Amino acid sequence: MSNSNRVLKLGLPKGSLQDSTIELFGNAGFHFSVQSRSYFPSIDDDELEAILIRAQEMAHYVELGAFDVGLTGKDWIIETGADVVEVADLVYSKASMRPVRWVLAVPENSPIKTVKDLEGKHIATEVVNITRKYLESNGVTAAVEFSWGATEVKPPDLADAIVEVTETGSSLRANKLRIVETILESNTKLIANKSSWDDPWKREKIESMALMLQGAINAQGKVGLKMNAPESALEAITAMIPALRQPTVSHLAHNQWVALEVIVLEREVRKLIPELKKAGAEGIFEYDINKLID
């Protein structure tokens, strides 16, 4: 098959990660259109074919070759034991740009204080294999039952404890649960089928995708600033800029003035711009950054 007719099959996570994943791909330059109730998003790239599927199943289907590449959590790779290529860490989740945690949680008034107190108890969770390995590593024997959902409501009547994923802990607190320990920290990963990874055309396509996705993540929460300043104020201005990289400085046609360009955290801009103005900067211009490639 000629490269002009080749297609890379991409698995996208359906559910809690779907919206943030589609947004991330958009920032990376891949624009999907998802129709209501459809599992087959369209995309502005003739070399990509996408399907929405639950993250829990993604690693299994990538291993089988149903997908060349997909996005799922480190947790589900471990849980399923899938033999796949882990191409890139993409640290984002449903509501933030940080990892999630699988935690052992119990009712607030539970006497359970450590994992050792779980001996002979009942635990409900979606990650049965991860939980069993955790208990085994701590020398604890307990019954681990698969939970089909609404895991937070099961203690104390249906389970003594749960192992549940959390991003902020708010859902656990709302259900009057207390975190005992963190079992696993997980983030989204771009994974590939081993045979697909060995295919030069597919590997190049996957690596390019990983580069652009990582660039979009790197740009989150950052903006660019451009400004002009008298050369006499350059030292003072560069000293006050909390730059992620050294600012780019260019001499203007008027040899007593310079142009500066720098990348900073967006949350620092509201304090920084007034200080730059006081220091002598002019024509200060803020712009969005979609991708930041290291």
Curated annotation (Swiss-Prot):
Gene Ontology MF terms: ATP binding; ATP phosphoribosyltransferase activity; magnesium ion binding
UniProt cross-references to Pfam families, sorted A to Z: HisG, HisG_C
Known catalytic reactions: 1-(5-phospho-beta-D-ribosyl)-ATP + diphosphate = 5-phospho-alpha-D-ribose 1-diphosphate + ATP
Keywords, in A-Z order: Amino-acid biosynthesis, ATP-binding, Cytoplasm, Glycosyltransferase, Histidine biosynthesis, Magnesium, Metal-binding, Nucleotide-binding, Transferase
Activity modulation: Feedback inhibited by histidine.
Protein localization: Cytoplasm
Similarity-based family: Belongs to the ATP phosphoribosyltransferase family. Long subfamily.
PANTHER family (UniProt xref): ATP PHOSPHORIBOSYLTRANSFERASE, ATP PHOSPHORIBOSYLTRANSFERASE ATP-PRTASE
Protein name (record): ATP phosphoribosyltransferase
Gene source species: Chlorobium phaeovibrioides (strain DSM 265 / 1930)
